[in-house]
From Swiss-Prot:
Subcellular location: Cytoplasm
Enzyme class: transferase
Bias (Basic and acidic residues) ranges: 694-722
Function, as annotated: Involved in mRNA degradation. Catalyzes the phosphorolysis of single-stranded polyribonucleotides processively in the 3'- to 5'-direction.
Keyword Transferase: yes
Residues covered by region (Disordered): 693-731
Protein name: Polyribonucleotide nucleotidyltransferase
Gene3D superfamilies with a match to the protein in the record: GHMP Kinase, N-terminal domain (3.30.230.70), K Homology domain, type 1 (3.30.1370.10), Nucleic acid-binding proteins (2.40.50.140)
UniProt domain S1 motif: residue ranges: 624-692
Keyword Cytoplasm: yes
Organism expressing this protein natively: Bartonella tribocorum (strain CIP 105476 / IBS 506)
SMART domains linked: KH, S1
GO function terms (MF aspect): 3'-5'-RNA exonuclease activity; magnesium ion binding; polyribonucleotide nucleotidyltransferase activity; RNA binding
Amino acid sequence: MFKTHKIEIEWAGRPLTLETGKIARQADGAVIATYGETIVLATVVSAKSPKPDQDFFPLTVNYQEKSYAVGRIPGGYLKRESRPSENETLVSRLIDRPIRPLFVEGYKNDTQVIVSVIQHDLENNPDILAMIASSAALTLSGVPFMGPIAGARVGYCNGQYVLNPHMDEMPESKLDLVVAGTESAVLMVESEAQELPEDIMLGAVMFGHKGLQPVLDAIIKLAEVAAKDPRDFVPEDLSDLEKAMQEMAEQDIRKAYTITDKQERYAAIDALKTEIINKFMPETEEDCQFSTDQIATVFKQLQAKIVRGNILDTKKRIDGRNLSTVRPIQSEVSILPRTHGSALFTRGETQAIVVATLGTGEDEQYIDALTGMYKETFLLHYNFPPFSVGETGRLGSPGRREIGHGKLAWRAIHPMLPTKESFPYTIRAVSEITESNGSSSMATVCGTSLALMDAGVPLARPVAGIAMGLIKEGERFAVLSDILGDEDHLGDMDFKVAGTENGITALQMDIKIDGITEEIMKIALEQAKDGRIHILNEMAKALTSARAELSEFSPRIEVINIAVDKIRDVIGSGGKVIREIVEQTGAKINIEDDGTIKIASADAKTIEAAKRWIHSIVDEPEVGAIYQGTVVKTADFGAFINFFGSRDGLVHISQLASERVTKTTDIVKEGDKVWVKLMGFDERGKVRLSMKAVDQKTGKEMTDDKSVKEEKCMDEKKQPENKRRRKKKEE
């Protein structure tokens, strides 16, 4: 019934299996990939023909994690998987980026790649396996895909590169780098690092590229026995149109690209494009030799040819800069004084307002991942409204691009954050892109670094980012620093590098062509380092390190630790005690399983009141200490005072005042607030308090009362015996 084909190899000490022909046979391509005991199913379906007037390649990649893969039922009311998580979106992009450039130019059939994690062993991360399975399914499908590609993860532990480290090894690694490529070229890199130098990062890329070669061989072997016949697809021959357009418009396009202002340049190019379309489009459709889509495609190709040629020939950029110059930078902090921290970062025509907010444990984000529930204390959100590029558009939930750019900036900042123990706040940074002409994600990195320091977050060092580009024609190439939007779209590489003065914290690279050599990447990294140091120096004009004090509008958090067996006492039955503390003091209180208690409030007095309350529950009263209490009951022989949490003690009638007292209610009544001193414990372990030992107006000890001194001497003699009696009673 099934005609299956299977390839198995040993890869980084674990078996990798690729199988096809048994599952999802109606898809154009389907592969079950297994690594260790993690299993994914990748399918590819591509429409037989493009939609009418389709002017782009509609590729969609959907990566989805099934709860049953780890033996769990989804949470929530519906008990089923719903909208993609942030991680699913990021992995979808991770797969999309290296495969998209490998489709034959001009192919515009609707194509969908769906990858499902159907089993997870909690040891092998499924993202690399999903990338491999997607590539294999595309290679088998017959669509015009010039692959295969493969991916690998690289760690860096104890000075050694590690290929595909287990998930539990990653916390000890100074590097988390994912590389994807073909047999001859690296196509994509995504990484987070602990301030590693450029040579270590480049070595990791090359190590990963070498490590993925056996997987490429396995995919090719599978394709040799299981691939479908290639589809009949011949790219359109538009050479006649290209020649005619070049004669008609080349000089006008060159003139338009001498305009340095982005909006003016775009207006000139759009007007020229409209003029050319009108010239090539006759009045009647029957006489049309070329479609609007074909004309627009060739126009873009001519733009790229002119811009790229100018840069290679003159070493000058669209805006007049040389290859390594960074655009003018202006940094400001505290632009929104009532927020906890804020910054405005402007680099040329790219600008970001970044606002930092400090929160408590209640603000931590709970993330329900396949590996289990965990809490995230650092959030970075990137917003890209349409007005930032002078356009109209929809507003709503963030798209894949916004999520991806935000995560890149998160990776850049994350290694420099203080530990949770030294800075127990939840941190949220929001980047609002207000202008964009290239590298808004790196502007987010710079702005976030400044905003966090403005908020008083003690970053280990400031972080900056820069986007690099590449123009390559044959043996000639030019590496560009701080690229514009046009240089990104018309170039061969988008290479983003973020880090401190000491090293790289995040690196993202997308390459659109083959032939990017190790030497070119080395030049790009060194040039990026120079640019990064320059940007850090410009940022230092606004702020060099974290402010010593938090904003007056920030919450204050104090941390205390109690014994684990005392947690129940602080919480109380059904949460009664902790609710009362919160309601009465106004503080926010978070209790962790290890006995760590975080008390938060903007008011120091509120925090102190909550601390005293908690200490009164978990601590033992100290002999000789003075407490403020409340009279809860009076009797002929004295008054009972609630003085330490729920603990009551007796003030004997002889200890109510220095003078002789004949009636308790002459001195105190129920509900009165009084100061008492803990004198000790009687023979039965009962608390003995004194009011006459304390000045009731100031709460300070009365040192001139002879009877108090005598009482103190007697208590000091009795304390050892009383402690023995209490211990015996407890036993």
